[in-house]
């Protein structure tokens, strides 16, 4: 029954997304008749002329929401009446994505929110944020029951992943706000695989991991428990949403292909809806596993309900990110590139 429901939902979403492309392209055709020079606005007998979009996504929660889009809107699978044709790549390191954006081999990418701000500062406005796609996904995991609060981490060793990105700054901020100097905690930065190895081999180990790495660890070792949700700890402080993942684009690409970017965002929002639907977990998990966004489909199925997918654009996106960036800036200006991003950083927020 669940499999049937997932297939029906996938079919419904496909029809919805195809209809969205048709609607977008009708507008584009009118703009073309008025003299628009955008490649995505040119109509032909076979359908609209497509604009190729080089899209990169981080493995893990930041990339999960795009799985449907990546699968069904590639250069090979994009419908004839849709102006978007994705060439997608999934990578594990923020640096791979930022390097690709800087050198122009990626046009649009899903990255950590603090990385987006740093990159905008580094490129002097060469990057804009298009949407927030992921909220809080960080957890403190433990073998044992000694950690009941952030304060309990004082004097402990914590294996963690995410140095130089949101996880490091969020952890340090939450420790400080709970009366613990981060220097009182032995935070050992590692890859997710190394953290998992330490947790499996240790008797009373503690770690910080994001979903789905946290999910995979708990599936591998039944003795590991979820001690704290850092989203819950953040919410206790009343500092707005813990906005951890976003979609960014190269400013040059955005200015040259505005209709394509808007069509991409329409499709991305629909993809988020599909990937976060609780009745379609099996189908969504299959896509995530197939594309290598998680290690396998089984982990994806367990992790999806905790991936905290969202889709926030325009003025709401700006308000959400500015509140989050203000917290990071006060804690460590270098975490977002030394200054608050300019208004032009926020696409469609005017």
Q: Where does each model-flagged region fall?
A:
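Sec-dependent N-terminal signal peptides of Gram-positive bacterial secreted proteins and lipoproteins
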Residues: 2-24
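Bacterial lipoprotein signal-peptidase II cleavage site
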Residues: 18-39
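Short, glycine-/small- and polar/acidic-enriched structural segments
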Residues: 43-180, 187-189, 205, 211, ...
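Short, solvent-exposed loop/beta-turn-alpha elements that line the ligand-binding surface or hinge
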Residues: 73-84, 155, 232-240, 309-317
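Pocket-lining segment of extracytoplasmic ligand-binding domains
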Residues: 113-115, 123, 188, 194-287
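Periplasmic-binding protein-like
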Residues: 132-143, 225-253, 303-306, 343-350
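Secondary-structure end/capping motifs
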Residues: 254-331
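Conserved C-terminal helix/tail region of periplasmic/extracytoplasmic solute-binding proteins
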Residues: 322-350
């Amino acid at each position: 029954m669940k499999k049937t429901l997932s297939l029906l939902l996938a079919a419904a979403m496909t029809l919805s997304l195809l209809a969205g492309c048709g609607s977008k392209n009708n507008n584009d055709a009118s703009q073309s008749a008025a003299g628009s020079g955008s490649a995505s606005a040119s109509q032909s007998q076979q359908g609209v002329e497509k604009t190729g979009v080089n899209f990169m996504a981080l493995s893990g929660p930041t990339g999960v929401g795009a799985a449907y889009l990546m699968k069904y809107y590639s250069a090979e699978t994009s419908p004839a009446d849709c102006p978007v044709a994705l060439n997608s790549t999934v990578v594990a390191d923020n640096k791979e994505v930022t390097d690709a954006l800087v050198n122009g081999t990626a046009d649009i990418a899903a990255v950590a929110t603090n990385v987006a701000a740093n990159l905008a500062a580094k490129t002097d406005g060469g990057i804009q944020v298009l949407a927030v796609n992921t909220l809080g996904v960080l957890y403190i995991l433990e073998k044992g029951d000694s950690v009941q609060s952030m304060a309990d981490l004082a004097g402990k060793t914590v294996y963690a992943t995410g140095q130089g990105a949101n996880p490091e700054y969020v952890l340090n901020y939450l420790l400080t706000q709970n009366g613990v100097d981060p220097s009182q905690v032995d935070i050992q930065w590692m890859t997710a695989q190394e953290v998992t190895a330490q947790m499996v081999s240790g008797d009373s180990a503690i770690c910080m991991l994001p979903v789905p790495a946290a999910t995979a660890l708990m599936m591998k070792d039944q003795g590991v428990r979820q001690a704290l949700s850092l989203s819950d700890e953040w919410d206790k402080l009343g500092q707005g949403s813990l906005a951890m993942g976003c979609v960014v684009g190269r400013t040059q690409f955005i200015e040259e292909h505005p209709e394509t970017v808007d069509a991409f965002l329409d499709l991305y929002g629909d993809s988020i809806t599909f990937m976060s639907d609780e009745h379609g977990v099996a189908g969504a998990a299959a896509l995530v596993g197939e594309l290598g966004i998680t290690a396998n489909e089984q982990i994806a199925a367990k992790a999806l309900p905790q991936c905290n997918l969202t889709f926030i654009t325009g003025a709401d996106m700006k308000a959400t990110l500015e509140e989050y960036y203000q917290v990071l800036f006060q804690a460590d200006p270098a975490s977002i590139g030394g200054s608050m991003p300019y208004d032009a950083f926020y696409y469609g927020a005017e």
